[in-house]
Structure formats: C-alpha cells, structure tokens
Regions:
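Short, flexible, glycine/charge-rich loop motifs used to bind or transfer phosphoryl groups or to couple energy/partner
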Residues: 65, 171-172, 207, 233-236, ...
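Short beta-alpha connecting loops at secondary-structure transitions
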Residues: 146-151, 305-308, 337
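Non-catalytic accessory regions flanking glycosidase/transglycosidase catalytic cores in CAZymes
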Residues: 2, 23-69, 390, 408-441, ...
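Bacterial Sec-dependent N-terminal signal peptides
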Residues: 1-25
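Flexible glycine-rich beta->alpha loop in the catalytic core of nucleotide-sugar glycosyltransferases
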Residues: 121-123, 295, 330
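Active-site clefts of carbohydrate-active enzymes
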Residues: 186-190, 249-264, 273-313, 339
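Active-site mouth of glycoside hydrolases
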Residues: 26-256, 261-268, 273, 284
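Aromatic- and carboxylate-lined catalytic core of secreted/periplasmic carbohydrate-active enzymes
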Residues: 280, 285-289, 297-299, 313-442, ...
Length: 466
C-alpha cells in the first residue's frame, strides 16, 4: 500500500517539477569545473545570505531591496518557519494562505533578481507541548501523527508525509525562474543521531532529486567545530546525490563540544580551514563547497556574538564574505545574523564590495585552483587561472580580537610586496582593489618580478594578469 501511494506522490511531484522546465532557474554544477556553479551555461558565483522572514512582506521587501542593491544574488530561506510553514495545525493539512506567501516571496525574488534555495525543515522536536524557548524548532502539527522526529524520518509513513509536503511546496516553486535548490533539513544532526540522519539523507537526496531533477539538492549539518563533526561531514561528502557540500562554521570561543582552537581565532583561518577540509573530503568526487552558514556566536552558541554592536565597520562581515571564495568555495560566505548585525549596522555594502572585487573573474573559464601563502605578516589566499590570478591579502597584524575585543585600531600596512616566485613569473601587470575604500588602481606594470602593493588597511585584492 505504501509503495503504491508513494509512487503516486513521486509521479505527481515529478510532473510538477518538470512540466515547466523551460522557465526554471537552470543553475547547475559546472561539468567543466565541478567546484563551481553555472547558470544557463555561464559561470554563476552566488553572493548569498541567510534570511528568515518573520513578520510581514514590507519587512521582507526591505531586506531583499537592501541586499540586491548591494550585489546580492542568492538567499537561503527556511520554508519551515512560522511565517511560511504550510503544515501548521495538523499533519497533511496545508494552509493555502502560507502557500500564497511562498508565491509572494518568489515574486520578491524575481523583482530583485535573487535566486532562492529553500530549507525544507529545521525541526529538532515533534511534540504536543514544549517550552517557549524551544518552540521555534518544534512541530505540533506533526505531533498529530508522529511521536518524535525519529519516527518521522525513519518510518515509511513519516517519509511519505515528508515527500507529500514537498510535493505541495514544489507545485508553487519548483519551476519558478528564481528558485534553484532544496535543502533537506537544517542541521539534522541536532535532531537525531547519525544512525537515523545518515540513512534518511541518503534516501531523501535521491528521492528529492528524482522528484525535482531541475533543482540542486543538498543536506546540512551543524557547525564544523570539533573532531566528531569532521567525521559527520566526511560521511555527508561521500554521498553522490549531495549536489554540493554545505558547511556551517561559526566563531565560537566555547568548550562544551571540545571546539577546535581555529574556530576561536582569526576568521580567515577559521574559514580557509573549513573549506580545505571540504575540498579534501570531496577530492575523489569534486563538487562545489559552500559555506552555508557563517557568523559569530556567544560561547557554545548561546546567542549572537556580543561583538556585533561594536563592529560598525563590518570587520567580521568582510571576512565572512570574502574568505570562503578565495579559499576555494563556490561563492561568498552565506552569512547569518542579518537581523542582529548586518541590518542594524547597515553593512550591506560589503556584499557590493565583494561583487566589485570579483568583477571579470571567471573561475570556470580560467580553470582556477585555490592556493595560499604567507608573506610579510600577510596571509594571501588566491585563485590561479590560465591567464590571471586573483588574491585576497589579509593583514595578520589586526583581526576581530585586536580591533573589537581589545579596541586597538587597525594599522596601515605599508611596503607590502608579492614576489611572483610565489605564484608564476609569466604575469606582466596587475590591478589593485581596496574593498574598504571601493577604489581601483588598474594595469600597474610588474617590476623586478614582484607586485608592489600600495598602503592598505586590513585587506586588499590583487589581480595578476599576462
């Protein structure tokens, strides 16, 4: 009985997801360079943020507008929050008003040219009653049929329910020109043990991909902050149907989970370490690495970082956005805390600076590969291509500890130079972009086999060309 009914659901959803393929977003993993994405055959670099609409569409449009005006082109949105959850009172009963909201959200996406990925669930509990502070991740609706999350993701009736809800949402968005991906579950390891989330993930990645072959499908785990999480990520990375590897990592000075020292230090190292782990885990089956959540928290994820109100210049945000791409990720860091940090401090312009920095850069056409080196107390993270190399150079003399914790202003870095022996001797000129002043200096001749870098504060972008 289950297999017959489920097959009908799969067929129905497959028709929904494929019927209007001509209008889909058509964002895919590049076949030429599978570390990156393409849109309609051209390289697509996501400049992305997380955003959870919670109040009304006036507020949502404000966020979309601010983000789009500053170069943003992608958002990750939980479709399971109170504002959007269609299954809000009883399992299998879907609220048409919430479905209409999903359509309205996609209208905003189209208006502002922002591509959307939906996270299908963020639940950690299924119960009739829960404490107010835990209600954000509980489903009372599913408690009308399931006793807990384990039953929901492990039983035949639970998986049938999961796919039925997906098919209803897919009817509204799967072929929308600004909808590109599904995420099975936010940080599913926080809800159930590995013995349950791993088989569910393997099965559902395949089933959701079969239902919606025109969208990307992925799964997410919690912050990559300790050895046990590395093991989880390694197993996730090995699943072929996981179209790209989503990594979460936060600045966290706590010790509850034996957090690595690297997640308590400079953001460029925190990020590059995570990206390198992802690249290593997927070296046999290359796919894009995406820093799907990045931010700063109070120790042991007790809340948004106390550093945020102090960071009016976006010292943290700059590193959150830039470090992933220059470390080998497929796009910018997908930032969290839009409501506690980015919007209150009006820091959206940092996304625009990233867009300006990568102007004319095509990692697929150039077959770019990540590399890094340190010189003169500066960490340099680069992407080397056939005819050009782009570098993000981060001064080690200052970071969030010196500026935000200790209150020491960043010093100007002077007399910095990049010997071409670190990279390649074929380049003849270079350009400089300062992301803090939004100023370019272009086509500077290379002399004495090195690039002489003008004085800068915190970081600088260098593009070397033949």
């Amino acid at each position: 009985m289950f297999s017959i009914k489920l097959s009908k659901i799969l067929l129905y959803a497959l028709c929904l997801c494929g019927a209007l393929g001509f209008s889909q977003a058509n964002i895919t993993v590049s076949k030429a360079h599978p570390r990156y994405f393409e849109k309609n055959g051209a390289t697509w670099i996501p400049i992305s943020t997380n955003y959870l609409p919670i109040q009304n569409f006036e507020e949502a449009e404000k966020y979309f507008k601010h983000f789009a005006e500053n170069g943003g082109n992608a958002m990750r949105i939980w479709v399971s929050t109170d504002f959007l959850e269609i299954e809000e009172q009883k399992e299998g009963k879907y609220n048409p008003e919430k479905l209409a909201r999903i359509e309205q959200l996609l209208q905003l996406a189209e208006k502002y040219h922002i591509y959307i990925k939906f996270t299908l669930h963020h639940l950690r509990t299924i119960a009739h009653n829960t404490s107010p502070e835990a209600s954000w991740c509980n489903s009372q609706a599913l408690a009308t049929k399931f006793k807990n999350v384990s039953e929901y993701i492990s039983s035949k009736k639970g998986k049938k329910s999961y796919l039925k809800r997906l098919s209803v949402i897919a009817k509204k968005c799967a072929n929308h020109p600004y909808f590109y991906g599904w995420e099975l579950w936010n940080e599913i390891d926080a809800a159930v043990p590995e013995a349950e989330w791993l088989p569910f993930t393997r099965e559902m990645l395949g089933k959701v991909k079969k239902l919606c072959p025109n969208q990307l499908v992925t799964q997410t785990l919690g912050s990559m902050h300790a050895p046990y999480m590395d093991d989880y990520y390694k197993k996730l990375a090995a699943i072929p149907n996981n179209d790209f590897l989503s990594i979460h990592r936060y600045l966290d000075e706590g010790d509850k989970w034996q957090q690595y020292p690297v997640v308590k230090g400079a953001i460029d190292s925190l990020v590059s370490n995570a990206v390198n782990i992802g690249l290593e885990f997927t070296k046999e089956n290359p796919k894009p690495i995406v820093i799907n959540e990045i931010g700063a928290v109070q120790p042991n994820h007790a809340g948004p970082s106390a550093l945020y109100p102090k960071d009016t210049e976006g010292i943290l945000l700059h590193d959150f956005i830039f470090a992933p791409f220059f470390g080998g990720s497929a796009g910018s860091g997908n930032t969290w805390h839009w409501d506690h940090y980015i919007e209150p401090n009006q820091l959206w312009y940092h996304f625009g600076r990233f867009k300006n920095a990568i102007e004319g850069i095509d990692p697929v056409a150039e077959a770019m590969q990540p590399f890094s080196f340190s010189s003169m107390n500066v960490n340099c993270y680069g992407l080397q291509g056939k005819t050009k190399t782009i570098l993000w150079c981060r001064d080690l003399a200052n970071n969030w500890k010196t500026e935000l914790r200790d209150g020491i202003p960043a010093e100007i870095k002077r007399n910095f130079e990049i010997p071409l022996s670190h990279i390649n001797n074929k380049y003849t000129h270079y350009s400089i972009y300062n992301p803090w002043t939004d100023k370019w200096e272009r086509h500077i001749p290379i002399e004495s086999n090195k690039a002489l870098i003008p004085a800068f504060k915190r970081s600088i972008i260098v593009i070397l060309e033949e």
